[in-house]
From Swiss-Prot:
Family the entry assigns: Belongs to the bacterial ribosomal protein bL28 family.
GO cellular component, one term: ribosome
NCBIfam families (alphabetical): L28
Protein name, per record: Large ribosomal subunit protein bL28B
Organism in which the protein naturally occurs: Mycobacterium bovis (strain ATCC BAA-935 / AF2122/97)
Length: 78
């Protein structure tokens, strides 16, 4: 399973974790990905999306219909 948000496109970030003695080791910061089910009233069906918590806020703000229309314009298959 990839840590990739379908709405915002957010992916893991990479960098170093630095210890007290300043030794560096590589690590990654994964976005908070949730699998959410939304109902599309226009199509009368449910869809399942893998979205970050920021993506959930975008859906709450803009509405699921607008977000799905935007994703389809970008070429994503929903």
């Amino acid at each position: 399973m990839s840590a990739h948000c379908q709405v915002t496109g957010r992916k893991p970030g990479f960098g170093n974790t630095v210890s007290h003695s300043h030794r560096r080791s590589r690590r990654r910061w994964s976005p908070n990905i949730q699998q959410r089910t939304y109902y599309l009233p226009s199509e009368g069906r449910r869809i399942r999306l893998r979205v970050s918590t920021k993506g959930i806020k975008v859906i709450d703000r803009d509405g699921i219909e607008a977000v799905v229309a935007r994703l389809r314009r970008q070429g994503q298959r929903i």
